Amino acid sequence: NIQFDNDKTSKVLGHLQVFGTPTVAPYWLMPFDTISTNSWIYPGLTNIYRVHTSGASTTHTDLTRENVVLTGTIDPTASTAVVGVGTAFSTELIVGDSILVSGETRVVASITDNTNLAVTVAFSDVANDTSPERVPGNYSATAAGGWNGGVLGGIAILNNGVDAPQFMGTANDAKMAALTNWDRTKTCAVMRPFKRFLVALDTTESATRYPFRVRWSHPAEGGTVPVSWNDADATKDTGYVDLSQSSGFVIDCLPLGDINVVYKEDSIWSMAFEGG
């Protein structure tokens, strides 16, 4: 092996393990700085970790998403029908989510409105829960799909094509969470930052795959995630295009100066922001 240093080429004399043994087998690697540490994020198939060193000490931290407290209260009865008080089921949950109510976990089968849903298995007639939770659980990444992402204005973005894209800020105790303002009924094979935008490629929307699709968010302010992906909102700089002029699917994109280079299986496209 060789290395490049000060415009010279030299032989690599060897290598040395720096960060110790990973907690999980890494399927991707991304440098990321928190407020006080320089670290590397490495996701496995089911969990995400970061590693950093301080002197002779190496620390591996689990960043896997945690339970999310839901709005309102739920007083379950011995029924699959669930009625909430002050809840926001329509915006905080989707079919297939797991919810934890008074110590019992159930899967959402259908959502009628903000205060009514059904679960696949009836709850017991247990106590009223003033802080019910959505239980996202571990990730479902595949070895074939792996992970991708990047850093948008100081925010870590990770995506595996199966779960909702994840984000994390720079606080030392931050954990991953589902990307705010992204419709969790959608997935994308790849998500990358470009300037102040996030770009999603090869999306699946309402269970239909769009392998030629390139979808972009509204531009984000520094240290925040995009406030919208709604292409129907004329007040936002969101949108999408289907690069279906050839049969190749979109597979990735990476910034090159002021353009975003979009790679298909059989062609390469350039993407640029031309707003005012």
Question: Where do the PLM segments sit?
Answer:
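Small/polar beta-strand repeat architecture
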Residues: 63-93, 98-146
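Recognizes the extracellular SEMA beta-propeller fold with strongest preference
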Residues: 1-68, 133-276
